[in-house]
């Protein structure tokens, strides 16, 4: 796992087309913005896991 430190307003790149920007920090919550092409799905982990479970692709702890 790559661990990075970013300040509010700073961005990191994933490949050539995906950017992740720190929008704000409030207490223990971080707001981030993700800019990705329309053909790249972006989900919170819990939503992704629900989608995979509905497809029958994932069992708990197996992703």
UniProtKB/Swiss-Prot annotation:
Quaternary structure note: Homodimer; the beta-strands of each monomer intercalate to form a hydrophobic core, while the alpha-helices form wings that extend away from the core.
Claim: Iron-sulfur is one of the keywords in the record: no
Keyword Repressor tagged: yes
PANTHER family: CARBON STORAGE REGULATOR
Subcellular location per the Swiss-Prot or TrEMBL entry: Cytoplasm
Phylogenetic classification of the source organism: Bacteria, Pseudomonadati, Pseudomonadota, Gammaproteobacteria, Vibrionales
GO MF entry, a single one: mRNA 5'-UTR binding
Source organism (scientific name): Vibrio vulnificus (strain YJ016)
InterPro entries: CsrA, CsrA_sf
Signal peptide: none
Pfam families documented for this protein: CsrA
Gene name in the database record: csrA
Primary localization class, coarse: cytoplasm
Name of the protein in question: Translational regulator CsrA
Family: Belongs to the CsrA/RsmA family.
Gene3D superfamilies given in the database record: Translational regulator CsrA
Classification via SUPFAM superfamilies: CsrA-like (SSF117130)
Keywords: Activator, Cytoplasm, Repressor, RNA-binding, Translation regulation
Entry superkingdom: Bacteria
Any one cellular-component term (Gene Ontology): cytosol
Function, in words: A key translational regulator that binds mRNA to regulate translation initiation and/or mRNA stability. Mediates global changes in gene expression, shifting from rapid growth to stress survival by linking envelope stress, the stringent response and the catabolite repression systems. Usually binds in the 5'-UTR; binding at or near the Shine-Dalgarno sequence prevents ribosome-binding, repressing translation, binding elsewhere in the 5'-UTR can activate translation and/or stabilize the mRNA. Its function is antagonized by small RNA(s).
GO biological process, one term: regulation of carbohydrate metabolic process
């Amino acid at each position: 796992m790559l661990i990075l430190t970013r300040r509010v307003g700073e961005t990191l790149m994933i490949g050539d087309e995906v950017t992740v920007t720190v929008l704000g920090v409030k207490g223990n919550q971080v707001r981030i913005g993700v800019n990705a092409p329309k053909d790249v799905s972006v989900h919170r982990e819990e939503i992704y896991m629900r989608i995979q479970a509905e497809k029958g692709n994932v069992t708990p702890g197996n992703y």
